[in-house]
From Swiss-Prot:
Protein name: Putative dioxygenase RF_0617
PANTHER family (alphabetical): DIOXYGENASE, PUTATIVE (AFU_ORTHOLOGUE AFUA_2G02910)-RELATED, INTRADIOL RING-CLEAVAGE DIOXYGENASES DOMAIN-CONTAINING PROTEIN
An example Gene Ontology molecular-function term: oxidoreductase activity, acting on single donors with incorporation of molecular oxygen, incorporation of two atoms of oxygen
UniProt-listed InterPro entries: Intradiol_dOase_C, Intradiol_dOase_core, Intradiol_RC_Dioxygenase
Organism per entry: Rickettsia felis (strain ATCC VR-1525 / URRWXCal2)
Family, similarity comment: Belongs to the intradiol ring-cleavage dioxygenase family.
Keywords, comma-separated and alphabetical: Dioxygenase, Oxidoreductase
Keyword Repeat among record annotations: no
Length: 208
């Protein structure tokens, strides 16, 4: 009887500490970010990651400056280098300050009459750590529209992703997230930062 009880306890103990077959392996599998599409992307994107002004122009904008940054990963959680990242959003007045790509859209959501230097769009390329960042401004918020930005990531080896970034307090982070050019961002500036790690479908490497 004692031998039976001892064997039962051993099997019960092993069962407690055994890994479940359904336990998610977070070491080599990341949850793919879902697509959320937006109809208001610009006809022409600005070729800089600073949405506050065009290249070579002085900045003159009305609103709070923010930093949007994070990492791009493939579905095996490997950082994706040399991915093209496109960002577009409204300004503090709630309108897109550019000409839209699509013609059948609500034209009331766009404006070309503004003395602000805010461009509303930009492009970044991820570094070898998969990191990206944009200098932007806090967009307009109302009962109908939450503060958000739209983003699209393209890479020749991965499925293109387009989604929406929720610029709420839950996604705020410190300045330790990613590498930022110290020339553009002074260390003493208390700029609100929002971090987003995005996962694309596919793999960039054949072997790990």
């Amino acid at each position: 009887m004692k031998k039976f009880i001892f064997c039962f306890l051993c099997l019960w103990t092993l069962n407690i500490f055994a890994a479940s077959k359904t336990y998610p392996n977070k070491l080599n599998r990341c949850k793919i970010t879902r697509n959320i599409f937006n109809d208001y992307e610009p006809k022409v994107f600005e070729t800089t990651n600073n949405l506050l002004r065009k290249t070579g122009r002085l900045s003159k904008f009305y609103g709070e400056r923010i930093l949007i940054k994070g990492k791009i990963l493939d579905q095996n959680c490997v950082p994706v280098a040399d991915a093209k990242v496109y960002l577009w959003q409204v300004g503090s007045g709630g309108k897109y300050p550019y000409e839209p790509l699509k013609t059948r859209v609500d034209k009331r959501r766009f404006t070309s009459k503004s003395d602000s230097s805010f461009t509303g769009s930009g492009i970044a390329t991820t570094n070898n750590k998969g990191e990206y960042y944009f200098i932007s401004m806090l967009p307009y918020k109302s009962s109908r529209y939450l503060r958000s930005a739209n983003i699209r990531i393209e890479h020749p080896s991965l499925t293109t992703l387009e989604t929406r970034l929720d610029l709420s307090d839950k996604n705020m982070c410190d300045n330790e997230c990613g590498e930022v050019n110290p020339i553009l961002i002074e260390p003493q500036e208390n700029m609100p930062s929002y971090c987003f790690d995005l996962v694309l479908q596919g793999t960039t490497l054949k072997r790990y």
